[in-house]
Amino acid sequence: MDKNLEYEPIRGAHILMIVNPVSGRISGEHTADKLEAWLKENGAAVDRFETTETENGSGYTAKLAENDYARVVVLGGDGTLNAVLNGMLHRALRTPITYLPAGTTNDFAQTLGIQKHLLDPYKSFTETEDRLIDAGKFGDGYFSYVASFGLFTKCSYATPRTMKRLLGHFAYVLEGMKDLHALDATPLAVTADGKFF
């Protein structure tokens, strides 16, 4: 990153940074160190928290209600972003999010055309604009771009991290193939825009 580059909109901003250090194929922690240093060099105050086996990022969003954060920075994959969004929506918080996709497939980022600026993360601040996205509710949880159920739902959660690191997206395909024998229909009721289907 260009250490001389100054980005005025973050000067004086208080930023909550949520990092999944084991996300995807690259070292999220190394990228987080670079980004945190750049934010601080440009005058931001940064509170950084890392996800663990017992804290997926959702719980850290409680800090948004306790502090005056200008922005949440999420460095991780689809699961990390989903956890943060759920934590925020359950608390009715609308703090802007900067998402740095660092997962195995980054479906959310690809769907919205978010570039993977991990080698130069400051571009996520300097070359993008905030935009509103829709969120839906499925049972007690929220979703931002996809809600799934049925046969292949569990494969994204059941796929071992070691397989994802070795095989990337293909690891999900292999995991999903294990359940092909259980193919069956699922009854469904949907309420959208006040209409029941």
Give the label of every model feature segment.
Residues 1-72, 82, 87:
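ATP/NTP phosphate-donor binding region
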Residues 6-9, 30-34, 57, 77, ...:
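Short hydrophobic/aromatic-rich motifs at helix boundaries and adjacent loops
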Residues 20, 78, 153-155:
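A residue-level signal for conserved active-site and pocket-lining positions in enzyme catalytic cores
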Residues 21, 75-77, 100-102:
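Glycine-rich beta-strand-to-loop/alpha-helix junction loops that act as flexible
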Residues 24, 53-54, 77-78, 114, ...:
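Short beta->alpha junction loops/turns
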Residues 41-42, 49-51, 90-197:
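Catalytic core of DAGKc-family lipid kinases
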Residues 79-84, 107:
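Short glycine/serine/threonine-rich phosphate/pyrophosphate-binding segments
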